[in-house]
Swiss-Prot record:
<keyword id="KW-0812">Transmembrane</keyword>
<feature type="binding site" description="axial binding residue">
    <location>
        <position position="98"/>
    </location>
    <ligand>
        <name>heme b b566</name>
    </ligand>
</feature>
<dbReference type="Pfam" id="PF00033">
    <property type="entry name" value="Cytochrome_B"/>
</dbReference>
<comment type="similarity">
    <text>Belongs to the cytochrome b family.</text>
</comment>
<feature type="transmembrane region" description="Helical">
    <location>
        <begin position="289"/>
        <end position="309"/>
    </location>
</feature>
<keyword id="KW-0999">Mitochondrion inner membrane</keyword>
<keyword id="KW-0479">Metal-binding</keyword>
<dbReference type="InterPro" id="IPR005798">
    <property type="entry name" value="Cyt_b/b6_C"/>
</dbReference>
<dbReference type="InterPro" id="IPR048259">
    <property type="entry name" value="Cytochrome_b_N_euk/bac"/>
</dbReference>
<comment type="function">
    <text>Component of the ubiquinol-cytochrome c reductase complex (complex III or cytochrome b-c1 complex) that is part of the mitochondrial respiratory chain. The b-c1 complex mediates electron transfer from ubiquinol to cytochrome c. Contributes to the generation of a proton gradient across the mitochondrial membrane that is then used for ATP synthesis.</text>
</comment>
<feature type="binding site" description="axial binding residue">
    <location>
        <position position="84"/>
    </location>
    <ligand>
        <name>heme b b562</name>
    </ligand>
</feature>
<feature type="transmembrane region" description="Helical">
    <location>
        <begin position="348"/>
        <end position="368"/>
    </location>
</feature>
<dbReference type="Pfam" id="PF00032">
    <property type="entry name" value="Cytochrom_B_C"/>
</dbReference>
<feature type="binding site">
    <location>
        <position position="202"/>
    </location>
    <ligand>
        <name>a ubiquinone</name>
    </ligand>
</feature>
<keyword id="KW-1133">Transmembrane helix</keyword>
<keyword id="KW-0496">Mitochondrion</keyword>
<protein>
    <recommendedName>
        <fullName>Cytochrome b</fullName>
    </recommendedName>
</protein>
Amino acid sequence: MAPNLRKSHPLLKMINNSLIDLPTPSNISAWWNFGSLLGICLATQILTGLLLAAHYTADTTLAFSSVAHTCRNVQHGWLIRNLHANGASFFFICIYLHIGRGLYYGSYLYKETWNTGVILLLTLMATAFVGYVLPWGQMSFWGATVITNLFSAVPYIGQTLVEWAWGGFSVDNPTLTRFFTLHFLLPFMIMGLTLIHLTFLHESGSNNPLGIVSNCDKIPFHPYFSLKDILGFMLMLLPLMTLALFSPNLLGDPENFTPANPLVTPPHIKPEWYFLFAYAILRSIPNKLGGVLALAASVLILFLAPLLHKSKQCTMTFRPFSQLLFWTLTANLLILTWVGSQPVEHPFIIIGQLASLTYFTILLILFPIIGALENKMLNY
């Protein structure tokens, strides 16, 4: 009998072991769809991004006009740009849900997979930030100015660091050029990191909603989960296309329709919606260095998740108190997102500070305590 090419060819064998004959737990729910959705997001973003880069000019005098030209004169340029801008939002929706799934079901106990995932999140955030600067509108310019300025909070070398990042004494042409370079480069880095992420995942195999070893009951990835993933793609592409075609500017900032002007500061500088929770945490501390440290900690805290797991059970499926805490954390993040979009005025300042405190308290203190408490309850 002739050998099956799919199983013997060096390249096809790798694809086969990752996407076709991969043993997969039979009970994984729709929450396990987001990994493949993130893959689709990345592919879409790279494709639309390459097409946009072909028409973009990384120069302060031409950047804004080149984006307008793409939307007006390039075949379907408006659609490509709208898909790219809103695709970023869907990328973040998927990654936040993916991380939420990981926290809920204890996937962080697969340490290598989890840590590469957090590095992926950081790289994605960097990519989105530098990408937002490229259209060179008012919010692009002032967002870049405010966020890069945070490096000046680093003791001793801060100011040097900022000027080195800017390539001058303010955000200007060199800054735009290097941001374009980074925005082009980082997605390919994300691709590489994704392969590492998947390599680590396939070492241990997938987690499942029960959090128990499922080796005795695994099924091939294809056709079961390949079909389920295609359903997921459809359900994501539908709202993405709806947003891109019906209200493409819904999630953007109207300030970005005005070309960048260093002499006029927008009344309220704020990042895109997916960074608002971190921005709220940054603003809630009245000290610059303290704010920067809190901002960094708000994301880097994910690295600590495996160390803070005190429960005897992997998932939260049978842990009602941890579940309550998890959904409180979710609500808290939504409050932070809302506060980040509001001006720095009386009620919002204190709400932001309380929400920031709650965020760190839940993750660092309450989760381990409740986990240990639930272990005690197992004895009764």
